Amino acid sequence: FNAIKQITSSGTKAKIYSFARGMHEDIEAAKECGATGVVIEIPTSEVKLKYQFPKWDTDTLIQKSVDSCAYAKKLGLETIYFGFDTCRADMATLDRLYSTLVAEARPDAIGVVDTVGCCLPSAVHMFISRLKKYGVPLQIHTHNDFGMATASSFAAMEAGANVIHTCMNGLGERTGNAATEQIMMGMKLMYGLDNDYHLEKIQAS
């Protein structure tokens, strides 16, 4: 809380998003510390529900997802739905979840989350392609357990993802996330995408 509050009061022009569990208290804290938006973390896979949230079933998952996103939107926060462990979730469950979520709460974006870094780039491409039907901007969040974070991020971009989550030098949880510098240089040199990023600041970062 204090770290995010310090960042939001620093005068930066960047949009600052706070992670939050699917709880009103967390969402209120994000609002209080001045965040532009909130990234709402909710489990989606059967294995996460079984071992981390054993009292939840699919109906509970959907209800909490809709409730938390609707509450964040009510507070005026940009709302990113971050259903973690997306890539190990049952596809029928995801379809039911997303169709209900978009109809009843309509988050500003949906994140596809490869929590344990087990998804091949081709599978990430499939996920993004399939979820485009919901008409909501899509984001990709990868981990590097099998060295696929950057490749999977580019696969998501090719499939139509609007945002790629990255970390400088890939310094994220466990084996890390997609490296900011790899994504930025790949977009410029491999895809020929012009952008206004200050690439000269990569080394200093």
What are these regions (language model features)?
Residues 1-205:
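Catalytic cores and adjacent flexible loops of soluble metabolic enzymes
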